[in-house]
Structure formats: structure tokens, C-alpha cells
Amino acid sequence: MASSSSPCAACKFLRRKCTQECVFAPYFPPDQPQKFAFVHKVFGASNVAKLLNELASNQREDAVNSLFYEAEARLRDPVYGCVGLISILQHRLKQVNHDLENAKKELATYVGPQAMLPILQPHFMSLPPQPQRPSSSSASVLTQHHHNLLPMMAIPTGQLYHQQQQQIFEAQQLAAVAREQQNEMFRAYGGGGGSSSPHHQNQAQAEILRFNNGFDSVPAGSVTVTGFNQLSSGGTAVTGMSLGGNFVDSPSTNNNYHTDQQLHHHHQPQQHHEAQLFIPSQSSQPLPLQTQETQTQTQPNSESEEGRRNVIG
């Protein structure tokens, strides 16, 4: 019961004296008159009093709050009342649960180690066995399936980078092996087969130095199909071909006979050396034998040249 000066909102609305046994006094304070007005208009004071008397004291406050909520909703919407709001909220809750289930199913296909099996198995099972020489159409189908599987398999970029580095390393190894074979060929040519004349040894060393130094200047003459320079119009400058295809100057002589002999003398060994240098795939073991054969061919030429010089002298 409220104080003697201020009765409860229910007794004030009903215009009656509020006593100590008033059932409305604890739940309808005097400062909330609208609360009892809504409840009384919808349910009636006698019905509310009867309901509160049937409930326990610890449940009465919740019952009064629910009655006020229902009465307010009914006055706002006389057709549906609070049922309309409840149905709308239930429909939204059902839609949210449906969307949540779909999201979980979609997420399950991308998460976990077993998520790849339902995706990859249909693609591999659908591919028929291809012949040894597939046609262009089957090759295009295989390429398309390959490109479709790559995004799903999610190959990391680090693996591609490792493959590129491996290819670069293999290319460097091949280049090093080729360079080693070339150096081995040069060493075999320079040190193979002892010569009987120091003139031929000096000539071989000079040819190796000319090959390492690159192209020398060519003052005059023209290159023929065989790779040798022809004589100029004056006939005073004769140029030969050094080892490896480099053109070098030959000392000029006044004797045309000796010039022809020098050209003929250089023609055979240089062609033989060119065959050795420009075919690196052959083994380097028969190189000393070839050098000895070349020297045996040049020895009769040098002896005949010395005999002719003695006759002329």
C-alpha cells in the first residue's frame, strides 16, 4: 500500500481507497498511471486482480510487465496486436537460420583437408583415357581442364619461383660443361703430338694466340668462298686465315712462288683445325693423332720448299 497521501495508480484510476491488502499497489506505482490504464482497457481490473491472486509473489511482476506489453501492442494494432510483431520476428529468424546453414555448407567446401576431394574427383573421373597422339580438340580439352584445376589446387607462388630457380641453375651447369669441353679441346690442341721442327711448334702457338686475340686487321684483299683472302691488285699483300676463322696479315714477299707455297702450306692444316674447332661434339681423344697426321703432311712440303730454295740460290 502506498502512503496515505498518494494511493496507487490502480486505485487512483478506479477512484477508490487504497488499502494495505491492495494487490495492484506493488506493481502500479502512482507515477505510472498510463500503465494501469492500458491494462485495464484491454483486460479489465477484475481479470488482472484475479490473475495476480492466482500467481506466486515472485512471478507477479513479470506477469504485470507482459500484460502491459500485450495491452500496448493491442491498442496500437487492434487486428494482430503483439502477434503480428512476433510473427514478423519469427519469419526473420527463420530466414537468418536458413542463410546461416547455406553459409556453413559453402564454407565447408573450402575449409579442411577433405574439402578438395569432392571438387577434384569429378574432374579426374570425367577425363577419358587419351590416346598416345591426341588430336587438337582433345589437347585443347586437356589444357582447359588443367587451367581449371590450377586455381582450385591453389599452387603457391613460392613453388613456381623454386622451379624457375632450378631451371636457371640447370642452364648454368650446361654452360659450364660446354665451357669446360671447349677449354679441354684447346688444351688438347695446344699440347698434343710433339713436332719434329720447332718452326711448327711456334706456328701452332702463334695460331692459338691469334685465336684468343680475336680478329686482326685486314689491310687489303677480299674473302673467297673457302674462307681465304685473295691477293690485292698490286700483288704485294697476302693475307691468311688464322685458327678459328680470324683473318690476320701475312708478311709480304717479293717472290710469288713462295707466296703460293705459303697459301698452299696453310690451306691443308687450317682446314683440318677448323674441322676440329667447329665440331665440339666429337671426342677429344683423337686430337693428338690428327695433329700428328697434319704434321706428317706438312713435313714433305717444308722439305720440298727448302730444296727449291737451294736450287734457286
UniProtKB/Swiss-Prot annotation:
Coiled coil: none annotated. It comes from the Eukaryota. Residues 6-107 form the LOB domain. It holds the Pfam family LOB. Residues 249-260 have a biased composition (Polar residues). Disruption phenotype: No visible phenotype; due to the partial redundancy with AS2. Gain-of-function mutants iso-3D, iso-4D and dsl1-D (T-DNA and transposon tagging) show flowers and siliques bended downwards. Expressed in trichomes, at the base of many lateral organs, including branching points of the inflorescence and floral organs and in the distal part of the pistil at stages when style and stigma start to develop. Also detected in pedicels and at the base of petals and sepals. Residues 280-302 have a biased composition (Low complexity). GO terms for biological process: leaf morphogenesis; petal development; proximal/distal pattern formation; regulation of DNA-templated transcription. Controls the proximal-distal patterning in petals and the adaxial-abaxial determination of leaves. Involved in the repression of the homeobox gene BP. Belongs to the LOB domain-containing protein family. This is LOB domain-containing protein 36. It comes from Arabidopsis thaliana (Mouse-ear cress). The lineage of its organism: Eukaryota, Viridiplantae, Streptophyta, Embryophyta, Tracheophyta. The gene is LBD36.
